[in-house]
């Protein structure tokens, strides 16, 4: 039965998402900004209606977003830079927001003077350009209105999207295509596991480009086409695809949004009462989460290329972990870890680095957060069973990321 989410639950979603997004999903929005956009929507009578998979009409049309966002090399960034970046101590524009339309227009005019002259038929993307992919997909499928959007992953930046759903009158489906975590590639989806067709899809960039993906070999090829587009567009590209409601009910992972809210609510309550947010998270997870390491940050290594951010996180153990070291490799999200140089927790299980005092998960997209000596706790979160199948491991296991490491379930590693 549908549930109307409260302001507290929406704010709790952001904290829960930061704790579950495995270092990815962008950066943490400013707390006051989240409160403002939620309050504005509620003041206008907008409802945040959470529905279960079972409540989706079988013959309805559901949209979901394909996309990738990360980084490109400095040389590529200089050609098509679509944002000022996320390197400021404050977290940069991923947190604060900025006038992207004005920024893109300035960049296009600069390119027009140098290496990319505009044509007589060129059109600069306007403030409504963000809806271009949505509108084109509707045309392709016979102008069918979507009943709702299926969330692709758990991300702290999703709160802005949820507010957008409320303004459009769309319900929030209590489900995702990746479970209760973030993932770096659109191919890492339960829709892929269940062979849901990805075409047609509409892909756009911030530069006014729109492409219809009419046919492709596989989800993996679609993802790599998208990555190529992103690489030569400043690091971001994406757009919607459509699915019939009955297929969403069969293929998506239920309960991911409510699970995230539950985690965030428990952590916020612990912080407000002077308790331990890590213990609160693990208790609220009901057997899904494990305290996997405790220590302090030694360093973070950060590289941008091919539409992603890549690197390593180095942690030095403290307390009961004194004398031990943890290394984590990430591609947007954390995927492989080594305890004292031996394979430890890996994807598809989640690896989350969290500040035990504030309860906020640390974001790989915000390098300034990773201060040397900062105290952290690593919480591992068990993957859903579908990710532990043969096809699931091909998509989210160590070998998908070119690491020849056998996957071992977290519950067999951390007791």
List each model region and its residues.
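Flexible, glycine/charged-enriched surface loops at secondary-structure junctions
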Residues: 233-247, 278-282, 291, 385-392
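Phosphate/diphosphate-binding glycine-rich loops and adjacent basic-rich segments that engage nucleotide
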Residues: 201-266
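N-terminal low-complexity or amphipathic/hydrophobic leaders
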Residues: 11-70, 361-384
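C-terminal non-catalytic interaction/assembly regions of soluble proteins
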Residues: 298-415
């Amino acid at each position: 039965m549908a549930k109307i989410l409260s302001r507290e639950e929406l704010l709790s979603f952001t904290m829960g998402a930061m704790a579950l997004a495995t270092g990815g999903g962008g950066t943490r929005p400013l707390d006051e900004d989240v409160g403002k956009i939620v309050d504005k929507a509620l003041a206008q009578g907008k409802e945040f209606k959470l529905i279960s998979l079972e409540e989706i009409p079988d013959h309805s049309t559901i949209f979901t977003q394909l996309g990738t966002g990360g980084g490109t090399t400095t040389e590529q960034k200089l050609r098509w830079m679509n944002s000022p970046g996320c390197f400021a101590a404050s977290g940069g524009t991923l947190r604060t927001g900025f006038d992207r339309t004005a920024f893109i227009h300035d960049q296009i005019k600069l390119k027009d003077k140098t290496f990319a002259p505009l044509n007589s038929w060129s059109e600069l993307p306007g403030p409504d350009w963000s809806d271009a992919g949505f509108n084109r997909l509707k045309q392709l499928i016979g102008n069918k209105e979507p009943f709702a959007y299926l969330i692709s992953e758990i991300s702290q930046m999703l709160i802005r999207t949820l507010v957008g759903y409320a303004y459009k009158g769309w319900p929030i489906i209590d489900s995702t295509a990746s479970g209760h975590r973030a993932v770096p590639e659109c191919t890492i989806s339960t829709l892929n596991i269940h062979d849901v067709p990805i075409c047609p899809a509409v892909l756009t960039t911030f530069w006014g480009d729109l492409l219809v993906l009419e046919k492709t070999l596989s989800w993996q090829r679609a993802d790599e086409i998208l990555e190529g587009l992103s690489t030569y567009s400043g690091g971001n590209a994406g757009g919607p695809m459509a699915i019939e409601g009955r297929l969403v009910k069969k293929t998506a992972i239920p309960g991911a949004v409510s699970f995230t809210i539950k985690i965030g609510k428990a952590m916020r309550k612990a912080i407000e009462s002077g308790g331990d947010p890590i213990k609160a998270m693990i208790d609220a997870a009901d057997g899904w989460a494990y305290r996997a390491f405790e220590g302090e940050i030694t360093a973070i290594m950060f590289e941008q290329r091919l539409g992603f951010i890549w690197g390593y996180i180095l942690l030095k153990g403290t307390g009961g972990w004194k004398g031990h070291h943890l290394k984590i490799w990430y591609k947007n999200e954390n995927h492989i870890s080594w305890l004292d140089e031996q394979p430890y927790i890996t994807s598809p299980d989640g690896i989350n680095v969290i500040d035990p005092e504030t309860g906020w998960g640390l974001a790989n997209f915000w390098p300034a957060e990773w201060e040397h000596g900062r105290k952290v706790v690593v919480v591992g979160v068990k993957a859903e069973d579908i990710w532990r199948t043969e096809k699931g491991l091909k998509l989210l296991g160590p070998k998908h990321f070119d690491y020849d490491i056998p996957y071992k379930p977290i519950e067999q590693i951390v007791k």
